[in-house]
Amino acid sequence: LHRGPPGSRGPMIPPLLSLPPPPRGRGPLRGGLGPRSGPYGRGWWGVNAEPPFPGPGHGGPSRGGFHKEQRNPRRLKSWSLIKNTCPPKDGPQVMEDKSDRPVCRHFAKKGHCRYEDLCAFYHPGANGPPL
């Protein structure tokens, strides 16, 4: 009960509670820096090997994630380019060529298709002569 509220109030009380018992000699030195680097100080004082490894370790996946995130917008851009370039090309083709293709089952059942002009199948009366 006592640990929760001080932790939520600010970082000054946990360093004062945690630093004097383990490093008594260096406690006063950390006292001045405690409010700023208290949580980090614990990690460095606790195990010196842990803070360096999570840094690069987390950096690697995050960087990989950033690369993937950068690639995904490129893919989205490429899809947007495809979407932007296909409708003008398909515009004339939609009215002419789609009549040779099978009838769109969604258009046949519902009378409409969510892909509309982008659909690869034949929409009678929409992208070709009615049946």
From Swiss-Prot:
UniProt keyword annotation of Zinc present: yes
Compositional bias per record (Pro residues), positions renumbered to this chain: 12-25
Molecular-function annotations in GO: zinc ion binding
Chain intervals with Gly residues compositional bias: 28-44
Chain positions covered by the region annotation Disordered: 1-77
Zinc finger (C3H1-type): 98-126
Pfam families linked to this entry: zf-CCCH (PF00642)
Protein name: Proline-rich protein 3
Organism: Sus scrofa
